[in-house]
Amino acid sequence: MAQSDPPKSPDPPLPTSIRNPQTPESGWDRIRELFQPNEQGHYPEEVGSIVKSAVTGALLGGIYGGLPAARHSKERYIQQSQAQIYQHRVEAVRSAHNAALRGFIRYGWRWGWRVAAFVTIFNSVSTGLTVYRDKLALSHYAAAGAVTGGLFRLNLGLVGLLSGSLIGAALGVPAGALISGLQSISGESIREKKRRERQELYENKVQEWSARLQVTDEVLEEMETSQQDPLEQQVEKIQELLQLPRNPAVSPKEGR
């Protein structure tokens, strides 16, 4: 009877540090994944884009509200200080510049934090819906615009809430179309890019893990070979000694 081949040992399991490249199936698991840094300590790209858009919105809002306010404050100060006497022309110019700076800071701050809050809420809601449903749709931006517009008009009561939601939803659709168009020009969306990067990272880690296992097996084989060599040499020496001819026996008479 032919001997059957010994069963192959199963492949060793991958370490826990090598995560599954597939995105989590649950929407809430994908949401929780947004707040978990990777091995390098970096947060997902979606969180980074929200922070960057908030900073950009604050800067643009500050410039949009601060520059006209600075010009208006300077002109108003000059008109109100026509009868004021200054010791030197430099003092008058400095006072006008200080008035412009105060106006820029005051109204720039007002516009800056409001635009930053608007952009942050809009991007947070749209990104959350996209991650939860794991797909990109214009309805996400419409819903984000409705939520943002309603919150900003909440102080006006129910009528303000409804009107703000309608206006926000209407403005969210073209904004979403613009964002989707920019992502299509780049070739892939953030979700597609994230899937590709997860798959590439997984493949690289598996290759590295396989290479480490191969090196470990080679080292173990060398150790076993080095341990077997001395034993084989000793066995050969014993066999050589056993094959040597025996010495002739010495009789008692010859010994005398």
From Swiss-Prot:
It holds the Pfam family Tim17. GO terms for biological process: mitochondrial respiratory chain complex I assembly. Keywords: Chaperone, Membrane, Mitochondrion, Transmembrane, Transmembrane helix. It is a multi-pass membrane protein. GO terms for cellular component: mitochondrial membrane; mitochondrion. InterPro entries: TIMMDC1. Residues 1-27 are annotated as: Disordered. It is found in: Mitochondrion membrane. The chain crosses the membrane at residues 111-131, 159-179. Associates with the intermediate 315 kDa subcomplex of incompletely assembled complex I. Belongs to the Tim17/Tim22/Tim23 family. Chaperone protein involved in the assembly of the mitochondrial NADH:ubiquinone oxidoreductase complex (complex I). Participates in constructing the membrane arm of complex I. This is Complex I assembly factor TIMMDC1, mitochondrial. It comes from Xenopus laevis (African clawed frog).
